[in-house]
């Protein structure tokens, strides 16, 4: 300790000191033995948010569809809306029903309407607004229970565009892939990423008005995905099959679909591409 006192008084002594001794003296500096004070306790309800969730049970026909409020402590919850729904189901109301699977924006299962916008619950952050958040099913769809909607018509429309490779000739090399150039492969970008969550179609007023005749943004995006595929040999037949005043031309370029897509795709752009191809055919 005498050496340490000398160092504090004499800059010359500090300059002559070896690095090893200097490091030992620095390391020997006493530390406070008193523990750090604990953080102040949070106020009760300081981080509590209300969620108004659509409820309807077909097994209770006397109870009409309604919004039910749940208060959730966000200090003990993940950042996404799906975290809130899971917390409510696990801790408050096990009867709350919704679809979910991957929790990574890949499967499209947890599509719903959150504060007026369609989106995936697993990718939508909890609103920082102090007002209550409203969670409801995808709009203008038949509700099976709570936040679960009937996707039958949506999938039938997807199936109707025959979303698979169709060829008239045998592959150049039987049993092997059909090659594509990088440029041809790039034409599929912005279409193959669709996860069929139905956020786009159920945000479209034209789809609300004509859900059985109009194919909707998702199905038409997939139609164009195969129209643009250089390996497919049924381009004309695909264009002819959707050249209809309802199937295709019921799109009025409102572009709600582009705003709603949780994957950042642009269905309106690809519908416009199909319309231009119809004029050129």
Swiss-Prot record:
It is a peripheral membrane protein. [4Fe-4S] cluster binds at residues 194, 197, 200, 261. Its EC number is 1.3.5.1. Signal peptide: none annotated. InterPro entries: 2Fe-2S_ferredoxin-like_sf, 2Fe-2S_ferredoxin-type, 2Fe2S_fd_BS, 4Fe4S_Fe-S-bd, 4Fe4S_Fe_S_CS, Beta-grasp_dom_sf, Helical_ferredxn, SDH/FRD_Iron-Sulfur. Residues 1-25 form a transit peptide. GO terms for molecular function: 2 iron, 2 sulfur cluster binding; 3 iron, 4 sulfur cluster binding; 4 iron, 4 sulfur cluster binding; electron transfer activity; metal ion binding; succinate dehydrogenase (quinone) activity. Residues 26-48 are annotated as: Disordered. GO terms for cellular component: mitochondrial inner membrane; mitochondrion; respiratory chain complex II (succinate dehydrogenase). [3Fe-4S] cluster binds at residues 204, 251, 257. Gene3D superfamilies: 3.10.20.30, Alpha-helical ferredoxin. It is found in: Mitochondrion inner membrane. Binds 1 [2Fe-2S] cluster. It comes from the Eukaryota. Pathway: Carbohydrate metabolism; tricarboxylic acid cycle; fumarate from succinate (eukaryal route): step 1/1. Pfam families: Fer2_3 (PF13085), Fer4_17 (PF13534). [2Fe-2S] cluster binds at residues 102, 107, 122. Component of complex II composed of eight subunits in plants: four classical SDH subunits SDH1, SDH2, SDH3 and SDH4 (a flavoprotein (FP), an iron-sulfur protein (IP), and a cytochrome b composed of a large and a small subunit.), as well as four subunits unknown in mitochondria from bacteria and heterotrophic eukaryotes. Belongs to the succinate dehydrogenase/fumarate reductase iron-sulfur protein family. Iron-sulfur protein (IP) subunit of succinate dehydrogenase (SDH) that is involved in complex II of the mitochondrial electron transport chain and is responsible for transferring electrons from succinate to ubiquinone (coenzyme Q). This is Succinate dehydrogenase [ubiquinone] iron-sulfur subunit 1, mitochondrial. It comes from Oryza sativa subsp. japonica (Rice). The gene is SDH2-1.
């Amino acid at each position: 300790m005498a050496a340490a006192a000398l160092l504090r008084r004499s800059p010359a002594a500090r300059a002559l000191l070896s690095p090893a001794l200097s490091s030992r003296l620095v390391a020997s500096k006493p530390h406070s033995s008193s523990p750090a004070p604990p953080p102040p306790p949070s106020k009760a309800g300081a981080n509590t948010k209300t969620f108004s969730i659509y409820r309807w049970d077909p097994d209770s026909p006397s109870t009409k569809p309604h919004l039910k409020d749940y208060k959730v402590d966000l200090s003990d919850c993940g950042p996404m809306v799906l975290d809130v729904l899971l917390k409510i189901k696990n801790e408050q109301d096990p009867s709350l029903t919704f679809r979910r699977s991957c929790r990574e924006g890949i499967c499209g299962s947890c599509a719903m309407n959150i504060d007026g916008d369609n989106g995936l619950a697993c990718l939508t952050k909890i609103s920082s607004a102090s007002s209550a958040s409203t969670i409801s099913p995808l709009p203008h769809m038949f509700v099976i229970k709570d936040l679960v909607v009937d996707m039958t018509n949506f999938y039938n429309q997807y199936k109707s565009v025959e979303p698979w490779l169709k060829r008239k000739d045998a592959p150049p090399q039987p049993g092997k892939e059909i090659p594509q150039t990088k440029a041809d492969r790039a034409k599929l970008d912005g279409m193959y990423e669709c996860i069929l969550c139905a956020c786009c179609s159920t945000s479209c007023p034209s789809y609300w008005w004509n859900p059985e005749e109009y194919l909707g943004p998702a199905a038409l995006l997939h139609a164009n995905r195969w129209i643009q595929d250089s390996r497919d040999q049924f381009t004309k037949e695909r264009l002819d099959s959707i050249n209809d005043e309802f199937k295709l031309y019921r799109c009025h370029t409102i572009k709600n679909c582009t705003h709603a897509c949780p994957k950042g795709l642009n269905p309106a752009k690809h519908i416009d591409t199909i319309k231009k191809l119809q004029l050129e055919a």
